[in-house]
């Protein structure tokens, strides 16, 4: 997934409109809902600093410029997601369902490190 190096990695609502959609947006935040099924993959995209809330238990492989990272997250996990560029794939047997609360006033430079995966 070398495309994660691209500075043009886009808005996930544009790169994967079948998986991401905006549920709330104002001048301070944008809330995205993400859903996919086992085996689904996303194109490289970027997130600003965000809070991630998992609404299902799932397994994912995240592809960053610096490598990959496998994550297992349980329903109800709430964590900080630093600004980053990545692509992902559902490596489990259950659908993924997540809310991202993206901060609009974030000035952080997106990370391309596997260590930037959800905390």
Features from the language model and the residues they span:
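N-terminal low-complexity, Pro/Thr/Ser-rich intrinsically disordered segments
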Residues: 2-16
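Short, conserved beta-strand element in jelly-roll/cupin
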Residues: 46-61
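Short acidic-glycine-tyrosine-enriched beta hairpin
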Residues: 65-83
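Ligand-binding loop in jelly-roll beta-barrel domains
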Residues: 57, 83-106
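Local beta-strand/beta-hairpin segments that build beta-sheet-rich folds
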Residues: 14, 19-24, 108-109
């Amino acid at each position: 997934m070398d495309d994660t190096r691209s500075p043009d990695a886009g808005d996930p609502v544009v790169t994967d409109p079948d998986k991401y959609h905006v549920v709330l947006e104002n001048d301070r935040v944008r809330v995205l809902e993400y859903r996919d099924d086992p085996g689904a993959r996303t194109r490289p995209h970027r997130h600003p600093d965000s809070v991630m809330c998992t609404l299902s238990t799932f397994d994912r492989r995240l592809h960053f410029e610096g490598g990959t990272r496998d994550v297992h997250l349980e329903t109800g996990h709430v964590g900080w997601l630093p600004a980053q560029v990545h692509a992902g794939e559902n490596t489990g047997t259950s659908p993924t369902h997540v809310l991202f609360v993206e901060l609009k006033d974030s000035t952080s430079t997106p990370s391309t490190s596997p260590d930037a995966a959800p905390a």
